[in-house]
Amino acid sequence: LFESQKSTGVVSLGELFDGNHDVSGFSDFDIENTAFALCRGGWPEAVVESRVNVALRMAADYVEELLDSDINRMDGIKRNKTWMRLIMRSYARNISSQASQSTIAADMQGEPPSEGTLSDYLDALSRACVTEDLPAWNPRLRSKTAVRTSPTRHFSDPSIACAVLHATPEKLLNDFETFGLLFESMCIRDLRVYAD
């Protein structure tokens, strides 16, 4: 949000890690603006686009381009567009959760692909930088829990999930559970950007 000038930048991650825990600040960026930012995404062209409807359409256009050609062009393997759309939709419904591959498959309508095919499709989405999962983590070095825990599911930008779910700012304001999960994903996206 800072890069799109929607954050004040008052709180510094560097200062927090250096021990300065005196955090204060105020922003007039309200919940409606947050819902819009979730659906618009952080795409450079969308951030500077003054026409709201055009800015909101960019993530959906990206998804369609991805499904129509990009996902097949990257390695020359022809993938089933319907399966890819259903996988992305399931991924969007499971955003910010530790959904396993079997959960994603069970969430698909109709006959899901085999476990190997699903793994290939998820790997293709990751290699195309469409998804960017947060690895399982446990503070105890020898804990087996981290080995058994699925990563937390995230798209590289939560607007992809909004596009796949046909979510609009208005719909998100009427579904605060989905709003919260997408907001969590946006926070992860921004923290990753700030950390780089």
Predicted regions and their residues:
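A residue-level signal for conserved active-site and pocket-lining positions in enzyme catalytic cores
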Residues: 4, 41, 87
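Conserved small helical "lid"/interfacial subdomain of P-loop NTPases
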Residues: 1-17
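Short polybasic/polar patches that bind polyanions
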Residues: 6, 38, 106
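Accessory nucleic acid-recognition modules appended to NTPase machines
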Residues: 47-196
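Amphipathic alpha-helical "lid/sensor" segments that cap RecA-like P-loop NTPase cores
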Residues: 18-65
